[in-house]
């Protein structure tokens, strides 16, 4: 017997206060497994998720094998984050209630909701915040302390009883909260049973509340509850021992070090951290807790490369936990994915492997199926021509043999057209490979389809400079922020950027990459001035800079002016000479079309759409030097690929600051996207053949230069480019991993 269950709850704020509705098919066995699970495997069939009348998933299957590591990929707006939140909030029917699911960013809120006696963020250090974020451990620690102090109290004989009852009451409160949640979401016979259980829980809770008010009890009950308190303490201590509670602080410190925190920053107050470091802190909270299912939504945001490599090694070595990750970082995703969940067309497709392997296999299958179909179409055309000739000859000469030949060939055409290869790669066998009732004797040849490629275009030829020369030249430049009694951020920097150059900056967070970009922009362009040294700029150079604050600035502006649209904002930035058709053309080239730019308020656009608006402001008209500081943060993998292809055509100079290895290699070092991202073949207007790759390699982009900013504020050119920096980052990550052990 199969039935459908339905659950509904308010969705997160970023969905505008709508509701998320989840439906799924469940058997009686599955329903029983929800209450008494034998494993932590998640298998949800016929799953549909709708947000505010917009369907994200439609009758698909979600299958998460216990302890396997998954990466979910899909374009921005397809609902990846919403799906993770639906799983974490318990909205998906069929997931056992006892399964502990942890979503990055939820840890602290859960602790506060559970009433854990935690310090306020104003007075809590980073280490305290991470240690105390584990609500289960914190509850056990508090209970153990309460019971120990009560049992050791030699004056008040009732103290252990009161502590025992108080803990029992608090646990009942948690059970009651969960009981309400279950009763609200179940219907039919199971809903009726859940409501009966809820009534019993409410009665027990009322009795417990009354027992807290009792001042005296008889000696027999006192003795029994004293023993119960001692037994409860032993149980709590055993639970703490099983979860290595004594090692919580050491583990938290090791994880924080791995994520790039220095010792002095670990002892800082959480309230003093910037937004990026707070995000790292929340990631540490998620990594230090036990969970059956760990959900990480874009965990590499704000991480530098050593921390990214440390994190991918940490996840690969994580045993016994199912991990589901969304990420825009292709290299990171490829490193951690044991299995891929592809979200497209409102379904989840499962593939055993990572994104690059999936794209390669899908592209190879598309080529194979295309060639097979073309060959069969040619054969079919020839047979149809022969049949037509036989029928004509039979009519002209009254030849029955020709009619029989035509009928025979027509039967052959109907029976033998279609897939010639079986499920296991051998010869097609009807009974094995095409069971059930079908209208033909061969399976139809299905060529895998691809999402339309994200194609970004913008003016790629900056105005002529009129006379030659370097765009920017830095000579012995040093910089220190005023009032800071420390070493300069940058020391003796020598760097020259010529027209059309490709320069990449790599280094740890805080090493001075953004500061160097600000110095290149100069004081007149909203940048910085050097403490010492000289910076010479071409007299006619125009520079544009995308910074990590570009999206925040647009968001703040849109919040103060909630009715302004992307089109109006772009035209205001350009000035009086702006023409609407030109502004629309620039925005359209970056993927923002029609009513999205003219009618939808800028404040309602997604992070990825705001990135495109920020780029439009920089690229109209195109500058001779374009500085991109972490431009990929809000973009999905397909959009990053589209941006890569557009930037490879850009004739101006590029200065790229990024931790994304794929982006650095393809934009700065000129490596072929066809080699690093097999899925780029699908962007070749359906021409799935080797010629596209060979043409790209023959065209060959001149490799740029990658520079590393050292901890001493110096800029050093990496002769081996990003490969050399990745080796340096890997060694740093290995040191951090050894510190963890």
Regions found by a protein language model. Give the residues of each.
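ABC ATP-binding cassette signature C-motif
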Residues: 1-369, 456-741
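Structured, non-catalytic alpha/beta "coupling" segments that mediate domain-domain communication
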Residues: 411, 415-417
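Extended amphipathic alpha-helical segments
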Residues: 298, 418-426
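Short alpha-helix boundary/capping motifs
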Residues: 284, 386, 415, 434, ...
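Hydrophobic alpha-helical membrane-spanning segments
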Residues: 157, 393-396, 419-420
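Charge-dense, low-complexity intrinsically disordered regions
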Residues: 430-470, 479-480
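ABC ATPase nucleotide-binding domains
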Residues: 367-390, 394-411, 424-442, 723-741
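Alpha-helix boundary/capping and short turn/kink residues
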Residues: 245, 396-399, 422, 483
């Amino acid at each position: 017997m199969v039935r459908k269950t339905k659950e509904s709850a308010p969705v997160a704020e970023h969905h505008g206060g709508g509701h998320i509705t989840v439906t799924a098919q469940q058997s009686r066995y599955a329903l029983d497994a929800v209450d008494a699970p034998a494993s932590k495997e998640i298998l949800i069939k016929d799953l549909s998720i709708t947000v505010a009348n917009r369907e994200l998933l439609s009758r698909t299957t979600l299958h998460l094998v216990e302890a396997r590591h998954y990466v979910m990929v899909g374009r921005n707006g397809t609902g990846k984050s919403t799906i993770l939140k639906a799983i974490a909030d318990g909205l998906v029917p069929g997931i056992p209630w006892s399964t502990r699911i942890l979503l990055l960013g939820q840890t602290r809120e859960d602790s506060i909701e559970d009433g854990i006696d935690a310090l306020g963020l104003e007075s809590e250090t980073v280490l305290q915040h991470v240690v105390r974020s584990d609500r289960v451990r914190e509850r056990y620690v508090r209970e153990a302390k309460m019971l120990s102090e009560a049992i050791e109290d030699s004056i008040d004989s009732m103290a252990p009883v009161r502590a025992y009852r108080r803990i029992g009451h608090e646990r009942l409160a948690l059970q009651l909260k969960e009981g309400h949640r279950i009763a609200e979401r179940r219907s039919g016979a199971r809903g009726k049973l859940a409501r009966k259980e809820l009534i019993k829980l409410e009665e027990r809770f009322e009795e417990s509340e009354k027992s807290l008010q009792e001042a005296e009890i008889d000696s027999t009950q006192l003795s029994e509850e004293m023993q119960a308190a001692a037994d409860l303490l032993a149980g709590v201590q055993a639970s703490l021992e099983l979860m290595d509670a004594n090692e919580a602080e050491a583990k938290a410190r090791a994880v924080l070090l791995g994520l790039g925190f220095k010792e002095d920053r670990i002892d800082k107050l959480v309230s003093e951290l910037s937004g990026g470091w707070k995000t790292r802190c929340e990631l540490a909270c998620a990594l230090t807790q036990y969970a059956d299912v760990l959900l990480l939504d874009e965990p590499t945001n704000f991480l530098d490369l050593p921390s990214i490599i440390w994190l991918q090694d940490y996840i690969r070595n994580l045993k016994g936990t199912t991990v589901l990750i969304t990420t825009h970082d292709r290299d990171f995703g490829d490193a951690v994915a044991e299995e891929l969940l592809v979200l497209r067309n409102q379904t989840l497709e499962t593939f055993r492997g990572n994104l690059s392997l999936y794209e390669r296999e899908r592209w190879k299958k598309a080529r194979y199926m295309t060639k097979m179909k073309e060959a069969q179409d040619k054969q079919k055309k020839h047979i149809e021509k022969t049949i037509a000739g036989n029928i004509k000859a039979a009519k002209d000469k009254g030849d029955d043999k020709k009619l029989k030949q035509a009928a025979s060939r027509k039967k052959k055409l109907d029976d033998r057209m279609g897939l010639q290869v079986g499920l296991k790669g051998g010869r097609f066998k009807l009974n094995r490979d095409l069971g059930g009732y079908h209208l033909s004797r061969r399976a139809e040849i299905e060529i895998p389809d691809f999402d339309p490629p994200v194609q970004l275009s913008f003016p790629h030829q900056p105005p002529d400079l009129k006379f030659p020369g370097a765009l920017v030249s830095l000579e012995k430049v040093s910089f220190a922020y005023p009032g800071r009694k420390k070493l300069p951020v940058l020391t003796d920097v020598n760097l020259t950027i010529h027209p059309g150059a490709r320069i990449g900056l790599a280094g740890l967070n805080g090493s001075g990459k953004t500061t160097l970009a600000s110095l290149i922009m100069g004081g007149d362009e909203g940048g910085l001035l050097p403490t010492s040294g000289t910076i010479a700029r071409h007299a006619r150079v125009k520079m544009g800079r995308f910074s990590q604050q570009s999206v925040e600035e647009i968001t703040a502006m849109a919040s103060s002016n909630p009715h302004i649209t992307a089109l109006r904002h772009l035209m205001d930035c350009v000035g009086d000479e702006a023409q609407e058709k030109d502004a629309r053309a620039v925005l359209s080239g970056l993927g923002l079309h029609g009513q999205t730019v003219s009618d939808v308020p800028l404040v309602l656009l997604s992070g990825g759409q705001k990135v495109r608006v920020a780029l439009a402001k920089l690229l109209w008209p195109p500058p001779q030097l374009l500085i991109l500081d972490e431009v990929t943060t809000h973009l999905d993998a397909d959009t990053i690929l589209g941006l890569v292809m557009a930037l490879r055509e850009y004739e101006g100079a590029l200065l790229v600051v990024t931790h994304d290895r794929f982006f650095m290699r393809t934009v700065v070092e000129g490596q072929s996207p066809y080699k690093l991202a097999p899925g780029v073949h699908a962007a070749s207007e359906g021409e799935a053949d080797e010629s596209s790759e060979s043409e790209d390699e023959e065209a060959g982009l001149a490799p740029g230069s990658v520079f590393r900013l050292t901890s001493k504020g110096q800029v050093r050119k990496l002769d081996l480019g990003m490969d050399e920096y990745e080796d340096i980052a890997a060694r740093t990550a290995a040191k951090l991993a050894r510190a963890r052990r």
